[in-house]
Amino acid sequence: MKDKIVLAYSGGLDTSVAVQWLIDKGYDVVACCLDVGEGKDLDVVYQKALDMGAVECHIIDATKEFSDDYVSYAIKGNLMYENAYPLVSALSRPLIAKKLVEIAEKTNSIGIAHGCTGKGNDQVRFEVAIKALNPKLKAFAPVREWAWSREEEIDYAIKHNIPVSINYDSPYSIDQNLWGRANECGILEDPYAAPPEDAFDLTTPLEETPDNADEIILTFKQGIPVQVDGKDYQLDDLILYLNQLAGKHGIGRIDHVENRMVGIKSREIYETPGAEVILKAHKALETITLTKDVAHFKPVIEKQFSEQIYNGLWFSPLTDSLKLFIDSTQQYVEGDVRIKLFKGNAIVNGRQSPYTLYDEKLATYTKEDAFNQESAVGFIDIYGLPTQVNALLHGGYSNEQ
């Protein structure tokens, strides 16, 4: 009886070739494909896995779990790796690993295989997550082991009659889920080359976007968007709706050269229309609902949290602690944010909250002003006292310093 290996199967080039490669190595392949909101035809993927030679294929709709348990933290934590990348692919990897482990345990498989290369981040994310969830399972990385070039891999696929939607002229590597779309390889590997329009799918070119803006109101409850223009949405449906609406206006294109875990720089093209709108609105609401010290400290946690996810450490004690902190800040992040969508921009035009810390009577310069300006004298004296003492001791600062 052959040993079974669960393969994270997408139906793309790498994993389709991996099925045949693992079979050649003497294993029975149990394919597993997750839907995390990419809109893929899973019936086609299911049949393709079996046609490739997999003995089983498990299709799992994890879109709602992805939005509620993972994307929700990206929103509450304003998560952006290197202040640019909203963790599109990285955010889905721990969930995918979790489901792969469940299937491996259910089918008595000896290990889990993935289609990641030896120079990417995902190999680390998957294998570290698998070790955290079930350290007895072995990890297999066919693409890393065969070390073929993209062209050699395509040749192998053609030789074994493996259908792939990729060619020598357009060898993009695409990953998509509810939170956005990531694209790399091909001409995109030249960081100076402008991305051609065929590298994009979720967003309209600026030249073709509507000449009239759309203005929407996002309503948040405990840091999570729950309504658009007064209409209730589940989080996954809300993101999909905003992907379509904001994408129509060309919002959410990101051209980023990022620092990978393995030490190289990689040029990535991301499309995150819904994410950009939600994150901008969420940050705007936090400006009136968080105290000054929390607002100033939270970005420190956000940066660490983003790096934990990017570096494949979702299942770790530190990440658990960071999640608790983020949750504790969101109790009063509730209210409405008005945001205009126009020509590639998501523009915040207003925000309100029943828990606002913004007091118009204290902020105004009209006759309604309730701020006691006489208090400023004593405040300045106390606040400036260390500076004054230092200046008296050392003779003050000269204009040349």
UniProtKB/Swiss-Prot annotation:
GO terms for cellular component: cytoplasm. Homotetramer. It catalyses: L-citrulline + L-aspartate + ATP = 2-(N(omega)-L-arginino)succinate + AMP + diphosphate + H(+). L-citrulline binds at Y85, N121, R125, S173, E258, Y270. The gene is argG. GO terms for biological process: argininosuccinate metabolic process; L-arginine biosynthetic process; urea cycle. Its EC number is 6.3.4.5. It is found in: Cytoplasm. Gene3D superfamilies: Argininosuccinate synthetase, chain A, domain 2, HUPs, Single helix bin. Its main location: cytoplasm. Pathway: Amino-acid biosynthesis; L-arginine biosynthesis; L-arginine from L-ornithine and carbamoyl phosphate: step 2/3. Keywords: Amino-acid biosynthesis, Arginine biosynthesis, ATP-binding, Cytoplasm, Ligase, Nucleotide-binding. CDD domains: ASS. L-aspartate binds at T117, N121, D122. This is Argininosuccinate synthase. It is an enzyme of class 6 (ligase). Pfam families: Arginosuc_syn_C, Arginosuc_synth. ATP binds at A8, Y9, S10, G11, G12, L13, D14, T15, S16, G115. InterPro entries: Arginosuc_syn_C (IPR048268), Arginosuc_syn_N (IPR048267), Arginosuc_synth (IPR001518), Arginosuc_synth_CS (IPR018223), Arginosuc_synth_type_1_subfam (IPR023434), AS_cat/multimer_dom_body (IPR024074), Rossmann-like_a/b/a_fold (IPR014729). Belongs to the argininosuccinate synthase family. Type 1 subfamily.
